[in-house]
Regions:
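A well-structured
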Residues: 1-178
Length: 178
């Protein structure tokens, strides 16, 4: 009869076989500080509401902030999710993952206006934006792909409601860990 192998604990695994999670954030405290800064980004994102159709410069400025917030969110999410995956019994990292999800949902709600506003910009006006703000070209592909879904886009209020439900939609994964 085969002997059942016991799964080694994390401290028994050689360093070269583990994620180099400290490359993302050296400590949990550094992660917490960065998460707090990310949460503050809600205000900056929300300050663009109702203004994306004003000019190419405004749209470009929003896209820059949006991209930076998403990049920072990717790092924060990777860190806490990898930490939570190390040992799913560790309540500290499960709580960090939950905290991150709360901030991510709030950020999604804060920028839920962007898709409807970008959709409302006419093709002619967007062409003018590209002409007056050449830096906006960097986001042409993203904006083009976004605008292709125009027929399937909700109003700003509906998008915000949907974005706010994000945490609730994660419940099955949180409960069952799948």
């Amino acid at each position: 009869m085969e002997e059942i192998k016991k799964i080694p604990s994390r401290d028994q695994i050689p360093a070269e076989d583990k994620w180099a999670i400290e490359d993302l954030y050296p400590t949990d405290e550094a992660w917490e500080a960065e998460l707090a800064a990310l949460a503050e980004s809600q205000k900056t994102l929300a300050s663009f509401a109702g203004r994306l159709g004003e000019s190419g410069e405004t749209l470009y400025a929003y896209m820059e902030v949006f991209e930076q917030v998403n990049a920072k969110g990717d790092l924060l999410g990777s860190y806490c999710m990898r930490r939570a995956d190390e040992d799913t019994r560790n309540a500290t990292y499960q709580a960090m993952a939950g905290k991150f999800m709360g901030v991510a949902v709030a950020l999604n709600a804060a920028c839920s206006f962007d898709t409807p506003e970008i959709m409302a910009i006419s093709d002619e006006k967007l062409a003018q934006f590209y002409a007056e703000c050449p830096k906006l070209e960097r986001y042409r592909r993203y904006l083009t792909n976004l605008r292709r879904r125009k027929a399937h886009t909700l109003s700003a209020a509906e998008e915000k409601l949907l974005a706010s439900a994000g945490e609730m939609s994660q419940a099955p994964d949180t409960i069952y860990g799948s």
